[in-house]
From Swiss-Prot:
It is found in: Cell inner membrane. GO terms for molecular function: proton-transporting ATP synthase activity, rotational mechanism; proton-transporting ATPase activity, rotational mechanism. This is ATP synthase subunit b. GO terms for cellular component: plasma membrane; proton-transporting ATP synthase complex. The gene is atpF.
Length: 176
C-alpha cells in the first residue's frame, strides 16, 4: 500500500504562477492586505478605540474608588453616630437610674414623714380623748360633789342659816 501512495504522489503537480506556489501567493496577499490596513490607518483607529476604552475603564475605576472612599466616609460617620448614640443611651440610662434612686429615696422619706405625721395625729387624738375623758370625769366628779354638797347643805341648813349667809354676802359686797 505504501507503494500505491508513492505512485499517486509522483503524479501530482503543484500549480504555480510566475514560478511561485500557492503558499507564497497567500503570504504576498496577506502582506498586501496588512499594508493596506496600515496605509488606511486601521491600527491607529484600533489604538484610538483601545485608548478610549482604557480611558472609560480608568474613569470607571476612578468613580469606583471615589464611591469606595465615600462609602468608607459614610461608614465612619455612621460608626461615630452609633458610638455617640450608645454613649447618649448610657448617659440616659445613668440619669434614669439616678432619678429612680432619687424617687425611691424621696418616696421613702415621704413615707417616713407620713408615718410620723399619722403617728403624731394618732397620739394627738389619744391625748385629746384622754383630756376629754379626764374633763368628763372631772365634770362628773364636780357634778357629783356639787349635788352631794347641795344635798348636805339642804339637809343641814334651815331658813335661818340661809338668812345669815345672805346677810353675810351682802355685807361683804357693801364693804368691797
Amino acid at each position: 500500500m505504501a507503494d500505491f501512495t508513492l505512485i499517486l504522489a509522483e503524479g501530482v503537480v503543484e500549480p504555480t504562477a510566475f514560478g511561485l506556489d500557492a503558499t507564497v501567493w497567500v503570504s504576498i496577499a496577506m502582506l498586501v492586505f496588512l499594508g493596506i490596513l496600515v496605509w488606511k490607518g486601521v491600527p491607529g483607529a484600533i489604538a484610538a478605540m483601545l485608548d478610549k476604552r482604557i480611558a472609560e475603564i480608568s474613569k470607571q475605576l476612578g468613580e469606583a474608588e471615589q464611591l469606595r472612599l465615600d462609602a468608607e466616609s459614610l461608614k465612619a460617620e455612621y460608626e461615630a453616630k452609633l458610638a455617640d448614640a450608645a454613649k447618649e443611651a448610657d448617659e440616659m440610662r445613668a440619669r434614669a437610674d439616678a432619678e429612680a434612686q432619687a424617687l425611691v429615696a424621696k418616696a421613702k422619706a415621704d413615707a417616713t414623714a407620713l408615718i410620723a405625721r399619722r403617728k403624731q395625729m394618732a397620739e394627738d387624738r389619744i391625748a385629746a380623748a384622754e383630756a376629754n375623758a379626764l374633763a368628763e370625769v372631772r365634770a362628773a366628779a364636780v357634778k357629783a360633789a356639787t349635788e352631794a354638797a347641795a344635798k348636805l347643805i339642804a339637809d343641814r341648813h334651815d331658813v335661818a342659816a340661809d338668812k345669815a349667809l345672805v346677810d353675810q354676802a351682802i355685807a361683804s359686797i357693801a364693804k368691797g
